[in-house]
Each structure stands twice: as C-alpha cells, then as structure tokens.
Amino acid sequence: MRPLAQASQGLFSSVNYVLTDMDETLTFRGRLSAATYGALERLQSAGIRVIPVTGAPAGWCDQMVRMWPVDGVIGENGGFFFQRAAEGHGVTRHFWHADKQADEQERLTVMARKITAQYRWATLAEDQPFRLSSLAFNLPANTTHLGALRQSLHEAGLKTTVNNLWLLAWSGEYDKLIMSRHVLRTFYHLDERAAQDSVFYSGDSENDAPMFAGFRHTLGMSTLRHQRASIPALPAWISQGPGGDGFIEGVDKILEHKRARASRFNAEL
C-alpha cells in the first residue's frame, strides 16, 4: 500500500466506474457526512457511474438506490444487485439465486435458529430482519468464539467473511468481486480486462479483499492499517483520512486526473 498522494498524474484518468464499500468507507463511526454525499454527486455529475458494494442488508440498499446519487447497489456481500431506473422511481432487483431466492432465504432462516441454539452467545445483527440473502452475526469479542462460529457455518455449507460490523454468512459461490464482475459485464458491457482501467474501488476491511485483489485501482481507508495482518489482499493505495474523508480523497484524485486529461485534449485541438 502506498499513500494515495503519491499516485502519478493521469493514473486514474480512465476511471468511469467507482465501486465502493459503505460502512466505514463512505461513513465514519456510522455517520455519512454531507461532504461524502456531495462527493458521490460530484462523481455522477462528471458522468462516472457509482455503485456501492456492501455487506449491508436489502432494506438499507433499497433506500440507498432510491435516494442516493448512485446507479445501483450490490448488497449483502454480492447476494443481489438493485438497479435504479433511468427515469422515475423504479428499482429492478437482480438476485444471485434468482428463481431459488425464497428457498435460499428459508435455508438461512433455519440455519440461524440452529446456530443460535448451539451457541447461546451468538446473536444476530439488529438488521437481520431486513436481509434477503445472508445472515449477519454480531462479532463475538472472543476470537475463539468467532472461529467456532465460522467453522460451524462452513460445515453447514455456507461462506463467511468479516467486516467492521458483522460476521456475514451466505449460500452460493459468490463474493463482492464475483458479483461485481457479473454486474459490470451483464448490465454495463464491461469485461474484466477493460475494468482494470475503468474501475476504482475503495474499502476498509476483510470482505473487501477480493476487490483489492481483483482490480488495479484500489484504495484502502486509513483505518485498514490497523488490521492489515488479517486481510488476505491489500489495496494498491491507502488514504490519509478515515472513512468518508478517505473516500473523498479518492474522488478528488479521480476528478483531478480526468480534468487534466480533458485539458490536454482541448489544448491539442
């Protein structure tokens, strides 16, 4: 990881998609600042598509895609993509499991009952009622408990990951990166090779590691330094500030590089 301030001029000039984690990347200590919201608006005003890629529940994602300056939201660590209609207030929902979504949701409900009965200390997150494709457990303070919980979920055939709020579990061969590539290819006709120049991703925790490994332009929030030993893949760049402040640094750098390229192009005319 290198300080973002050291990025060479023009490096991000081809970025047309900003994908970003939400909790403690757009927010800081659970709050979204006006400046961060404004940064999302600045990206859209510059013609850059914005897609949060988050572990957050469907209920949160529905509100985000309807009211925030974003083009869509990938939620519950890749379980679905909610896409805002180009005109009006409509939202189209695309689930990884598609026709099997109801069955998968029931399977997760049964598993949650088993796990909380097996481990009395295991508690579901307050937002679990608003989830459609994942389980979210409050992070145990005891690392032994966390390991036991993950092992039981894996033995049941579920995938798991951790962010700064929850232990997330789901059924299916996907994660943030796999679903992001599917969305970019299916809805924006952007293949993996083209995405290396066109996509910028920002995040702050373990569940962002696949994105850090899968894309060239990646930014970690400054708080990531404290957990770098537990993250399988690190971002190319690190911000100076935490949460939304770090995200704004990335937005400023992208827009600066794009303005410089436009100025050079106009000067050559």
Model region roles, listed by residue range:
Residues 31-127:
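Active-site phosphate-binding/coordination module
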Residues 68-69, 77, 156, 214-215, ...:
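Short, structured coil segments at secondary-structure junctions
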Residues 27, 51-53, 202:
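Structural motif
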Residues 4-48:
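N-terminal glycine-/serine-/threonine-rich phosphate-binding loop
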Residues 8, 13, 33, 180-269:
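Mg2+-dependent phosphoryl-transfer enzymes with acidic/Ser/Thr/Gly-rich catalytic loops
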Residues 18, 43, 73, 218-220, ...:
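Short, well-ordered beta-strand core segments
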Residues 111-214:
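Conserved acidic, metal-coordinating active-site core of Asp-based
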